[in-house]
Amino acid sequence: MPDPNRVLAGKKATLHNPNVSQQAKERAEDYIESHSSGQETGDYSAQAGGRDLDYEDLGDYDEDADFDNEEGLNVLGDESGFVDDPMKTGDLVEEDQLEGKNIENVRGGYKATMHNPNVSKQAKTRAQRALEEIDDETQA
């Protein structure tokens, strides 16, 4: 059973998170108002009959609350939930990105991407091009 103090701390963090929708912040505020009385001092009297009251608010969950901009893009990525590749623009590998890094570890990461069945073809293609660029830079 979740610790009520930690649940409240999470709800309070939601209020201060800029990546959370206004609707989610309002629900967190409502939750804090209805559940904080006495619980902050360790009094768990709000748990009636041993039931876990922490999940009562999930019944009215609105999937649109996760989308926080006009385009309907998930704040953590695109419509599919995937985060854009930070290497999408410009050169795939810049020299200053490799400074201070073990080049073999970087190459290993790209090779792992190419062999990972959970990675898109587009990401595998980018990894292949990045490997080629690294090879060109290290040979030069």
Curated annotation (Swiss-Prot):
Record GO cellular component, one term: nucleus
Family matches, as InterPro entries: Conidiation-specific_6, UPF0654_domain
Region (Disordered): 1-88, 110-140
Bias kind Basic and acidic residues: ranges: 24-33
Composition bias, Acidic residues: 54-71
Disulfide bridge partners, by residue number: none
Biased composition (Polar residues): 34-44
Top-level lineage group: Eukaryota
Family: Belongs to the UPF0654 (con-6) family.
UniProt-listed PANTHER family: UPF0654 PROTEIN C11D3.01C-RELATED
Identification of the protein by name: UPF0654 protein C22G7.11c
Source organism: Schizosaccharomyces pombe (strain 972 / ATCC 24843) (Fission yeast)
